[in-house]
């Protein structure tokens, strides 16, 4: 079941067309990558899908509802979309716990539900031991996990991850990959973009590669690394022999009460 679809997106800056007819879709519980060389239009495409930019042409649909003109905060509030920015977004002077509570208050979550939800997220992201630590004193990995936890406060149906592997060590990268897989098992759809192509291809069900403002290739990691155009313009001879690719299966979630509630989700069976 398709959760998000971008139809024929176009965007120009001055006389330069940066995105020229990009179409992509994401199913429920699916991890989808968005890759491409610098200047290819990948970031602009991602920002249009998030609601940070408005396309000149084309549509963005969330569960078949046109949200093209919705700003990011409305997509988060009413459309079930979460967003993890590339730059650190935590409140450095607040504790990890206070960061989560602040987001809950911003979303008008009932006060009697806040502590329970906070405890769930701290445990899920393995940061309970730093709940009383100021965010500015957390390690890079702890801070990234806190940012992911904040992204899930509202129980989104799809999350957009912008450079989640930037500035963290290999062990933490593996930890974040594990979390992303778990989120997919829980039925959350994920669109992820990063310069770390290998790490992206290790966890995605499908990936789109953008070049010169258009989709150059889409498919599994194996499809991507074998595509001659992708090799020439982007990946070169990247070695992914040891990579395991998640295999989607279908499961079912309880209703969330939102207009965009799924009747079925896809999750991986790792």
Label each residue range with its predicted role.
Residues 155:
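Conserved catalytic motifs of ABC-family nucleotide-binding domains
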Residues 101, 112-130, 178-181:
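Conserved ABC ATPase "signature" region
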Residues 66-82, 87, 111-115, 225-228:
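ABC ATPase NBD coupling module
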């Amino acid at each position: 079941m398709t959760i998000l679809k971008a139809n024929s997106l176009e965007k120009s800056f001055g006389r330069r067309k940066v995105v020229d007819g990009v179409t992509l879709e994401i199913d429920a519980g699916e991890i989808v990558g968005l890759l491409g060389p610098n200047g290819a239009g990948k970031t602009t495409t991602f920002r249009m899908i998030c609601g940070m930019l408005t396309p000149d042409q084309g549509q963005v649909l969330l569960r078949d509802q046109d949200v093209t003109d919705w700003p990011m905060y409305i997509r988060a509030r009413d459309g079930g979309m979460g967003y993890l920015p590339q730059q650190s977004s935590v409140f450095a002077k607040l504790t990890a716990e206070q960061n989560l509570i602040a987001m809950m208050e911003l979303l008008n979550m009932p006060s009697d539900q806040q502590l329970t939800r906070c405890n769930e997220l701290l445990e899920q992201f393995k940061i309970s031991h730093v709940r009383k630590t100021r965010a500015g004193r957390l390690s890079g990995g702890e801070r990234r996990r806190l940012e992911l936890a904040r992204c899930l406060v509202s129980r989104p149906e799809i999350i957009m991850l912008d450079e989640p592997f930037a500035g963290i060590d290999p062990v933490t990268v593996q930890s974040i990959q594990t979390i992303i897989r778990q989120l997919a098992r829980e039925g959350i759809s994920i669109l992820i973009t990063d310069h770390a192509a290998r790490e992206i291809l290790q966890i995605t069900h499908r990936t789109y590669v953008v070049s010169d403002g258009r989709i150059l290739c889409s498919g599994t990691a194996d499809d991507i690394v074998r595509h001659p155009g992708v090799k020439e313009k982007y990946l070169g001879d990247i070695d992914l022999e040891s990579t395991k690719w998640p295999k989607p299966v279908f499961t079912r979630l309880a209703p969330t009460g939102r207009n965009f509630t799924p009747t079925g989700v896809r999750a991986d069976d790792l």
